[in-house]
């Protein structure tokens, strides 16, 4: 497995995308028979992406200065080609032409509780918001569990794609966002939620 990364320009600043590339068995790049087109993030050309023989799954999408955001590490491969598909989806989202993302996500990231919370985030429709308490109720947490839900939301490694910006305070105020409240306001404004 190879860790790949790229930077993508956006209204939030330069986004850092990190993924895991794994060679598909029987792929054209591997010389196997019966190769099929995959669902990787990128394009052909460097052995990564949809037709390059490797499937790339998104691990992280961070904004500049993000609390707990990914940082490029030694041994990671800079591979913008691996992220062609997600870059296009992000561009369409920021241009108002798309309301959802369809990208493969790396499995096994986060605790079981965090993954349950993140699944709720993925179910929040574009242009809608829910409270931290509503998320807690959906995962079966109550009372003090709201704090744990807030912590899990704050550790979401896939900003924008997994829309934690759609979670607000019970009183309608914007609270906590690893990328900063100004970016949360920008995203909700883009979706027509705040002016």
What is each stretch, according to the model?
Residues 1-143, 194-195:
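Basic nucleic-acid-binding alpha-helical/helix-turn surface characteristic of O6-alkylguanine DNA
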Residues 164:
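Short cysteine clusters
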Residues 161:
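Major-groove DNA-recognition helix of helix-turn-helix-type DNA-binding domains
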Residues 145-149:
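Helix-turn-helix DNA-binding helix
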Residues 156-157:
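Terminal helix-turn-helix DNA-binding modules in bacterial transcription factors
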Residues 170-195:
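…primarily DNA-binding HTH/wHTH and HhH modules…
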């Amino acid at each position: 497995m190879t860790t790949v990364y790229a930077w993508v320009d956006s209204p939030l600043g330069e986004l850092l995308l990190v993924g895991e590339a794994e060679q598909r068995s029987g792929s054209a790049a591997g010389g196997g028979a019966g190769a099929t087109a995959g669902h990787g993030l990128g394009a052909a050309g460097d052995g990564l992406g949809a037709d390059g023989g490797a499937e790339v799954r998104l691990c992280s999408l961070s904004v500049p200065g993000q609390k707990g955001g990914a940082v490029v590490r030694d041994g990671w491969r800079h591979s913008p080609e691996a992220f062609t598909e997600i870059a296009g989806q992000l561009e369409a989202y920021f241009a108002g032409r798309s309301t959802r993302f369809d990208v493969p996500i790396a499995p096994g990231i986060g605790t079981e509780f965090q993954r349950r919370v993140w699944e709720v985030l993925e179910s929040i429709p574009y242009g809608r918001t829910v409270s931290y308490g509503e998320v807690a109720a959906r995962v079966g947490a109550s009372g003090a569990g709201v704090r744990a839900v807030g912590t899990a939301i704050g550790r979401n490694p896939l900003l924008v794609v997994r829309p934690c910006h759609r979670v607000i305070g019970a009183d309608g105020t914007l609270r906590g966002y690893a990328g900063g409240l100004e970016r949360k306001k920008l995203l909700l404004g883009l979706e027509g939620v705040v002016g």
